[in-house]
Amino acid sequence: GMDGLLTIRPDGKVYIQQGVGNLGTGSVFDTARAAMEALQTDWEQAEVVWGDTSKHLPWSSVQAGSMTTHAHTRANWAAGLDAKSKLQEIAARDLGGTPSSYDVADGRVFRRGNRSQGMTFARAAERAIALGGKYDGHEVPEDINDMTKTAGGALAGLGLMGIAKDNFETGGRNMSYAIGFAEVEVDLETGGVELKDYKVSSDAGTILNPRTFAAQLHGGGIQGFGHARGQKWV
């Protein structure tokens, strides 16, 4: 699996490092949402950092073969869960109890059954910096890629770090399926073809972005029209 990397900083924001590029589909942002879902915190509290390797980015997949969404929702989910675990541990250290006594949501870590007892992400980030070690990124997991270790080292000390490799079970190959139906009229004398109607259906699982999903279906259809009408055997 790929690696996920984020930092919760003293300004209270979650900075999600994204190694995938922006091809125009928005996947560089959409796949980062998995980290915020793990933290049960509003997307407006996130900042996505992407671009070249000078931005300290984690080991990532190529953007081909329908890999991006599958690989990077999982990697960011792993980083989000790692950050959540560290938030719970810090809360237990400072406020008593065990990490499992605490939950994370809405930019805070708080005691289950008593949301008033807890701390903000901003405060937890300050505590992570004070504690050091794995909490602020001075210690990182052994199983992550060397590129991610370098990125984590550059970001160490900025706040609470979530850094993890996607070690989740795969359950085999996961594929999405789409099927299209075209109604056409063919002029038997001239060979002209006119498209009258087109319907498409897709079994795609969880939709990250409805607009991008629709664009995938429309774009695939248009590409298919071009193949069918504009190409021939030579």
Mark where each language-model region is:
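Cofactor-binding beta-sheet edge motifs in enzyme active sites
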Residues: G1-V234
